A protein has these predicted regions:
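Phosphate-binding P-loop
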Residues: 45-53, 80-81, 85-86, 90-94
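Feature marks short, highly hydrophobic, charge-poor N-terminal signal-anchor/signal peptide-like helices
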Residues: 1-8
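Loop/turn-to-beta-strand initiation segments
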Residues: 98-99, 138-141, 174-180
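N-terminal pre-Walker A segment at the start of P-loop NTPase domains
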Residues: 13-48
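Glycine-rich P-loop/Walker A and Walker A-like loops and their local beta1-loop-alpha1 context
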Residues: 51-83
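Conserved P-loop NTPase motor module
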Residues: 212-298
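Conserved nucleotide-sensing/catalytic segment adjacent to the nucleotide-binding pocket
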Residues: 106-170
Length: 298
């Protein structure tokens, strides 16, 4: 009896899940490449490689911990991966991994001040020559606090051109990641929203930093994040060293200086750059329980 139940269950699983069906029908390939990839992973020390290709924006109002979460992510990558020995597939040898942070907020770890998005494009062009000379592999992390407001500066946002967008779309190949923060995802420039991967909604309770990860495209189609089911949730405990890891006064001073220099866009230009689209909840596939209830009651 139990054998029949298990057999029927296995057939249902194979029928419903293409990945399981593919693995079951290619047992020798799964075994061979499983061993081969595991050996390569250990031999090339891939566990030391810093993950790149992220285009994430942390969102939340004042006191929600969006900048705290942004800095926690960026400094965590530096502390974990900088100086590690990694395999460079282009040169076919082991080199030292170098984590280069471009940030407009003062950090407790080494960083270069981010004055313009052109620096991100420049990093994709000059780091290879630097790496060849110093036997390194540079990972570039762009950290942009108050991204929505920063893009209101002409000198900062004028670099959002096809070259910059192409760099972002191929950022994994250039070993680049971009992390930003904004009060609301809709406050960010439309061109940036179109290439964003994840939106992280932040909520802080005492020293408990609770964050929810959303697909950026699905969040683009609703006005209320509660209508979308999070991809995942996480929480971490905030320590004193996390508060000391950054200073946002540099961001405020830079914005004040740009305003005094009349470098900011007009209100009409700001609203046009945001290009708010009409919400299309029907385009959301990962609806929350609240959204499904609203749909049923229509």
């Amino acid at each position: 009896m139990w054998g029949l139940i298990l057999t029927v269950g296995a057939v249902i699983v194979v029928a419903l899940f293409p990945a399981v069906r593919c693995a079951v029908t290619h047992p020798l390939h799964v075994l061979w490449y499983g061993v081969l990839d595991s050996f390569t992973y250990l031999r090339h020390k891939d566990y030391n490689c810093c993950h790149t290709g992220d285009l994430d924006i942390y969102c939340g109002y004042f006191g929600s911990g969006k900048t705290l979460s942004l800095v926690h992510k960026v400094t965590g990558l530096y502390e974990r991966y900088d100086g590690k020995t990694v395999w460079c597939p282009r040169r076919g040898k082991f080199v030292t991994q170098r984590v280069l942070i471009l940030s407009n907020v003062a950090l407790a770890v080494p960083y270069q001040e981010l004055r313009s998005l052109a620096q991100v494009v420049a990093a994709s062009k000059v780091t290879q020559a630097y790496d060849d000379e110093h036997d390194t592999l540079t990972v570039t992390i762009a950290c942009v606090d108050e991204l929505g407001v920063q893009l209101n500066s002409r000198s900062f946002r004028d670099n959002i051109d096809p070259t910059f967008l192409s760099t972002l779309l191929c950022c994994r190949h250039y070993y680049i990641s971009l992390y930003g923060s904004a009060q609301r995802f809709g406050h960010v420039d439309k061109l940036m929203r179109d290439v964003t991967l994840n939106v992280i909604q932040c909520r802080k309770i005492w020293r408990l930093q609770c964050n929810s990860w959303y697909d950026a495209w699905e969040l683009e189609n609703v006005t209320n994040p509660e209508l979308v089911r999070p991809l995942r949730r996480g929480c971490w405990f905030v320590r004193n060293k996390d508060y000391r890891a950054y200073n946002t006064l540099a961001v405020v001073d830079t914005l004040t200086k740009r305003f005094e220099e009349k470098d900011m866009l007009s209100e009409a230009e700001i609203l046009a750059a945001r290009a708010p689209a009409a919400p299309t909840p029907d385009a959301v596939t990962n609806k929350s329980r609240k959204a499904r209830k609203i749909t049923r009651n229509k």
